[in-house]
Amino acid sequence: MKNMIFSANISKALCLATVGITLMMPAQVAAATPAMAVETQAVNEQGGITVFPNKEAQYRIPAIVECKSGKLIAFTDHRYHNQDIGGGRHLDIVMKTSMDKGATWSSPEQMVAKGGNGIATSFDCAHGDAAVVVDKKSGRILLMCASGGIGYWESKRGHLLMMGRYYSDDEGKTWYGEEVTKQIYDLMPEVESAFFTSGRICQSKQIKVGKYYRIYTVLCTRSGNRILYSDDFGQNWKVLGKNVAEAAPRGDEAKVEELPNGNVLLSSRAMGGRHINIYTYEDKKTATGSWGKVIASDAKNMGVAAHKNSCNGEVLMVDAKKNGKKVKLLLQSVPVGPGRNNVGIYYKALETPADYATPEAIAKNWEGCYQLSNTTSAYSTMVQGKNGSIYFLLEENAFKNPKTQTDDYYDIRFYDLSIEQITNHKYK
């Protein structure tokens, strides 16, 4: 099966050709037979908007939700010391809103979770890496995050990287939060450092035990991924699967998505692509089941290829049509590369149960990739709006002062995309 990358311009396509992707002009596509093809498409037509400009502050780590009213909320870290949580550094989680589907955004930034007390062992030293979901029925917003002033590599029992939980019941106008460090670490006695992967928390469309539909999120730990679920919208969490340590033993930041049969797809950050696994339910109500064998998805199996980079991205399943036939379409965003450059969205249809029966089936033979960015770009996330649009938020245009700053920070940019755009009109 051929993969096709729809690139923003010829110069970018030439760059992709250097990473082992065969370059072809559009007129040559039908007659040629390479593994991957590049076709031109102007990125500026997509109308990207800078929500958080890097000239105003040191921004990183995007998340986005659509509220019940249609209001959009974009979240990011405001990093005052140009680095992640640790060493007592100050980070806040901030937000902006849009009432017109992303055409315009509020200003200035609004505070969600404020840090800055300078005490590394205090919960309110810093907050970052927002993972967010809106409950489909009530409209309540849940945000899980990393907190405190102890870093991921410094963390150990008795001196832990902390965790926070925030709720809003008025579409982000007000927030109330609390520390949940003990509650989460008590689920995993073997883990000494963990944080919630930023971006989208997945809510089930099928499984409802009690008042809420089930939600899923993934912890990044130094011993691989730990997948959690909650049946009360984040008040209490449980580990998904007795063999959860086998889900992705080398996993990094990861996302989950619900498959058409209710099983859970794990897509974890990896050098060169993703690590893929599936949790197969025995009993959905009690959440019993088991994880399969993790499989790499990368250029070797015509999967999700992230050349010379390992980066957080989003996995999302949407309803689509091909020639009038309904299909489930799986999307995965990553920097196409080389390095943290050229963020794109890979796609593949799940047309039959065999297409998502095993991790291997999902990992291989992705159909194509829409390259959205033609510059430095890294973390990305997306949700599908009520109108069918794919609301996409990413880090773009890296910047740092090499004399005074150790890490890049970015513009946080928004794109309103359609399934037709992403798939070059193959699906709609």
For the regions a protein language model found, what residue spans apply to each?
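Bacterial N-terminal signal peptides that target proteins for export
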Residues: 2-15
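Sec-dependent signal peptide cleavage junction
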Residues: 26-33
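Asp-box/BNR beta-propeller blade signature and adjacent active/binding-site loops
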Residues: 33-428
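Bacterial N-terminal signal peptides
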Residues: 13-26
